Protein backbone atom coordinates (compact mmCIF):
# COMPACT_ATOMS: atom_id res chain seq x y z
CA UNK A 1 0.00 0.00 0.00
CA UNK A 2 2.94 2.35 0.55
CA UNK A 3 3.14 3.14 -3.18
CA UNK A 4 -0.25 4.86 -3.00
CA UNK A 5 0.96 7.43 -0.46
CA UNK A 6 2.60 10.69 -1.52
CA UNK A 7 4.99 12.17 1.01
CA UNK A 8 4.89 15.90 0.38
CA UNK A 9 7.28 18.65 1.43
CA UNK A 10 7.21 22.42 1.17
CA UNK A 11 9.23 22.18 -2.05
CA UNK A 12 7.11 19.45 -3.71
CA UNK A 13 3.61 20.31 -2.46
CA UNK A 14 2.32 22.71 -5.12
CA UNK A 15 3.70 20.69 -8.03
CA UNK A 16 2.28 17.40 -6.74
CA UNK A 17 -1.10 18.89 -5.84
CA UNK A 18 -1.37 20.30 -9.35
CA UNK A 19 -0.83 16.86 -10.91
CA UNK A 20 -3.85 15.29 -9.24
CA UNK A 21 -7.32 15.69 -10.71
CA UNK A 22 -8.85 13.15 -8.31
CA UNK A 23 -9.73 13.88 -4.69
CA UNK A 24 -6.60 14.11 -2.59
CA UNK A 25 -6.68 13.45 1.16
CA UNK A 26 -3.79 15.41 2.65
CA UNK A 27 -2.92 14.16 6.13
CA UNK A 28 -1.02 16.69 8.25
CA UNK A 29 0.67 14.60 10.95
CA UNK A 30 3.73 14.19 13.18
CA UNK A 31 5.74 11.15 14.23
CA UNK A 32 5.07 11.73 17.95
CA UNK A 33 1.28 12.12 17.48
CA UNK A 34 -0.55 9.00 18.67
CA UNK A 35 -3.92 9.97 17.10
CA UNK A 36 -2.08 10.52 13.80
CA UNK A 37 -0.71 7.01 13.93
CA UNK A 38 -4.14 5.66 14.89
CA UNK A 39 -5.94 7.14 11.87
CA UNK A 40 -3.19 6.38 9.33
CA UNK A 41 -4.32 2.80 8.53
CA UNK A 42 -7.89 4.02 7.96
CA UNK A 43 -6.70 6.67 5.50
CA UNK A 44 -4.58 4.09 3.69
CA UNK A 45 -7.56 1.71 3.47
CA UNK A 46 -9.80 4.42 2.01
CA UNK A 47 -7.19 5.38 -0.59
CA UNK A 48 -6.71 1.73 -1.56
CA UNK A 49 -10.46 1.05 -1.74
CA UNK A 50 -11.00 4.15 -3.88
CA UNK A 51 -7.90 3.71 -6.05
CA UNK A 52 -8.15 5.93 -9.10
CA UNK A 53 -10.63 8.37 -7.59
CA UNK A 54 -8.86 9.17 -4.29
CA UNK A 55 -5.19 9.54 -3.42
CA UNK A 56 -3.50 9.96 -0.06
CA UNK A 57 -0.74 12.46 0.68
CA UNK A 58 1.04 13.00 3.98
CA UNK A 59 2.75 16.14 5.28
CA UNK A 60 4.91 15.90 8.39
CA UNK A 61 4.26 19.18 10.23
CA UNK A 62 7.56 19.04 12.11
CA UNK A 63 9.50 18.86 8.85
CA UNK A 64 7.24 21.31 6.97
CA UNK A 65 6.08 24.00 9.42
CA UNK A 66 5.55 26.67 6.76
CA UNK A 67 3.20 24.40 4.84
CA UNK A 68 1.23 23.68 8.01
CA UNK A 69 1.02 27.42 8.70
CA UNK A 70 -0.07 28.14 5.12
CA UNK A 71 -3.13 25.92 5.63
CA UNK A 72 -3.80 27.06 9.19
CA UNK A 73 -3.06 23.67 10.73
CA UNK A 74 -3.27 24.10 14.51
CA UNK A 75 -4.18 20.56 15.59
CA UNK A 76 -3.15 17.20 14.25
CA UNK A 77 -4.15 15.03 12.68
CA UNK A 78 -5.84 17.35 10.21
CA UNK A 79 -6.98 15.87 6.93
CA UNK A 80 -7.67 18.25 4.06
CA UNK A 81 -9.83 17.02 1.21
CA UNK A 82 -8.55 18.73 -1.93
CA UNK A 83 -9.82 18.71 -5.48
CA UNK A 84 -8.28 20.61 -8.39
CA UNK A 85 -5.78 22.14 -5.96
CA UNK A 86 -8.47 23.62 -3.70
CA UNK A 87 -9.41 22.67 -0.16
CA UNK A 88 -12.99 21.40 -0.33
CA UNK A 89 -13.38 20.07 3.22
CA UNK A 90 -11.39 19.07 6.29
CA UNK A 91 -11.45 16.84 9.35
CA UNK A 92 -9.56 17.54 12.56
CA UNK A 93 -8.73 14.67 14.89
CA UNK A 94 -9.54 11.00 14.62
CA UNK A 95 -12.93 10.19 13.17
CA UNK A 96 -14.63 6.95 12.10
CA UNK A 97 -13.97 5.58 8.63
CA UNK A 98 -17.66 6.05 7.79
CA UNK A 99 -17.41 9.80 8.35
CA UNK A 100 -14.36 10.07 6.10
CA UNK A 101 -16.11 7.98 3.44
CA UNK A 102 -19.15 10.32 3.51
CA UNK A 103 -16.88 13.30 2.87
CA UNK A 104 -15.17 11.51 -0.01
CA UNK A 105 -18.51 10.46 -1.51
CA UNK A 106 -19.73 14.07 -1.37
CA UNK A 107 -16.71 15.17 -3.42
CA UNK A 108 -16.89 12.39 -6.02
Q: What are these model-derived regions, one by one?
A:
Residues 1-26, 30-55, 63-78, 82-108:
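Proteins that catalyze or organize thiol-disulfide redox chemistry
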Residues 58:
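Conserved residues in the N-terminal Rossmann fold of short-chain dehydrogenase/reductase
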Amino acid sequence: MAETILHLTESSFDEEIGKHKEVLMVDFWAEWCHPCRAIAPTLEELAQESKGSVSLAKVNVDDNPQLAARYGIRSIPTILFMKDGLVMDQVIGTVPKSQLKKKLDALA
